[in-house]
Every structure is written in C-alpha cells, then in structure tokens.
C-alpha cells in the first residue's frame, strides 16, 4: 500500500520455488504460471486483498541497452516547454530506433536534455526555447520473452500493469540519490543471473544482465570437492569467500558436518580458490 508519507508499505508477501526459468529465461511457461499463482495467492492471503494486476520485474541475458536521441519542436507559441513536449521527445527517441522485429523497447530513460543552445538540462519543463532534444538510455528486451511472461501471468489469474527491468528496480530500491550523484555500481548476484547498474552524476550510464549466478559457484564447488549440490551450497554459505588470502592454508572443513555420508577434510583455501576462479 502507499502510505500517507507516499512511501510503500508492505502488507503481504508471497514466495514460491522458481520453476520453469533458466538463467532468467522462461523455458516452461506452465511451471512459471503455477509458481506465480502460488506466490500471488500467498501474498493475497497475508494482505487480505485480492489483486488482478501486478508490476513485473524483467531479467535475463536478452536485456540490452543503448544510447539514443530524439528531437521535437516546442509546441507552445510562447516557447515554454510542457510535459507533453517532453513525452513527445522521448517518444521520438523510441521512434528513431531501428530494432529487429524480435525486440521491443522496455524503457527510454532520459539522461539529459538540450534546449536550443542550453545543454545538460535535467528537467526542461517551464523553460523557453524552440528545439528540444533528449539524450536517453533505451532498454530493450526479447519480444518473445515478454509475451511469454504475459501469458504465464494470465494463466496465473493476473495481468501486468507495467514492467521494469530488474537492475533498475534493484537500484531504485537500495541506492540513495547522493550515491547516484557521486557515482556507483550496483551488482546483484542471483541464483542464475547477475545484474549490474552503473550510475554517474545521477544518471544511469549502463545496465546489464549476465547469465551467471551463485548457482554456478555452487556447481563448481560440487565438482571441485566431488560432493553433492546440497553439501556444496552449505559449504559455500558457511565457509565461502572469493579471496583465498583471507583464510589460512591450513584451515580445513569437515564435510561430514553437512552430510553423514560424506567423509574427509577439505582445505578452505582450496574452496576459496574455486570460488575466486
């Protein structure tokens, strides 16, 4: 819910095992629909409210971004820039893109505007001029994947009100404006994907999603130690570090503590080397 101070208040949470998705890409729409339905049902039960529309966070290696510009003439006779002029300018950014048929625009995020000879304008509304130009970061995604998500949500009994790419959603949730102004990189490591968002001078410079996550580290540990995935995950969480120099070469981990069927001691330094690699 939106509280009186305009901040969001969490009234319900729902979770479900992520099935039918591999590295951020839907591979089984029916399994995704069942997971969405279960998570939504739990959230509705906790909150006491039903919801027929949701906001969707998009991820996957098909998420790409590129710079683009758009130009329009200021519409008012007195030359004052209106919200409609800004909207038309961003629409022109999208219109000037040459995208293949299998991709579509998710966001056109303005970085700065130029009004005649005035550059690096953050918000041109209310200013006066003749020619308005927008410099934007355009985020695109796979049309097929977006449609697959929409179909899965419909099967789950809901619809997407709007979509936002995961790196941008994560940045909006955890970064302060001062951090964006100073410049920072937000890296979000998930189970099968890792996303990043790069900010400088308050602007989003770049975002990306890579098909590598913490699950790949777990798999590497399982192979390196010749143990099960469950034991490898437990070892990673309790003893894992990406810097071998943080641990002593004589430190050892007893695998039998995680599974009675496992035997032997392994070097924690070796575990760190696997994670670092």
Residue ranges: model-predicted function:
Residues 211-232:
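A conserved active-site cap/scaffold subdomain adjacent to cofactor or substrate pockets
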């Amino acid at each position: 819910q939106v509280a009186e101070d305009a901040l969001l208040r969490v009234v319900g949470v729902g979770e479900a095992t992520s099935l039918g998705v591999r590295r951020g890409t839907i591979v089984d729409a029916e399994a995704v629909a069942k997971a969405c339905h279960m998570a939504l049902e739990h959230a509705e039960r906790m909150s006491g409210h039903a919801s027929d529309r949701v906001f969707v966070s998009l991820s996957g290696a098909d998420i790409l971004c590129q710079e683009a510009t758009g130009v329009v003439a200021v519409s008012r006779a007195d030359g004052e820039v209106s919200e409609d002029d800004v909207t038309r300018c961003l629409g022109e950014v999208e219109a000037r893109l040459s995208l293949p048929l299998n991709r579509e625009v998710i966001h056109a995020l303005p970085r700065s505007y130029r009004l005649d000879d005035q550059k690096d304008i953050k918000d041109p509304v209310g200013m006066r001029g003749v020619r308005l130009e927008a410099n934007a970061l355009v985020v695109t995604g796979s049309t097929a994947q977006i449609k697959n998500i929409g179909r899965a949500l419909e099967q789950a009994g809901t619809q997407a009100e709007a979509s936002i790419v995961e790196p941008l959603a994560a940045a909006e949730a955890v970064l302060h404006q001062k951090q964006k102004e100073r410049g920072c990189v937000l890296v979000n490591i998930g189970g099968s994907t890792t996303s990043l968002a790069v900010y400088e001078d308050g602007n989003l410079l770049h975002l990306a999603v890579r098909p590598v996550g913490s699950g790949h580290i777990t798999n590497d540990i399982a192979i390196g130690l010749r143990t099960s995935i469950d034991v490898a995950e437990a070892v990673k969480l309790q003893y894992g570090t990406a810097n071998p120099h943080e641990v002593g070469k004589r430190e050892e981990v007893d695998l039998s503590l995680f599974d009675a069927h496992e035997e032997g001691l392994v070097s924690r330094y070796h575990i760190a080397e696997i994670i670092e690699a």
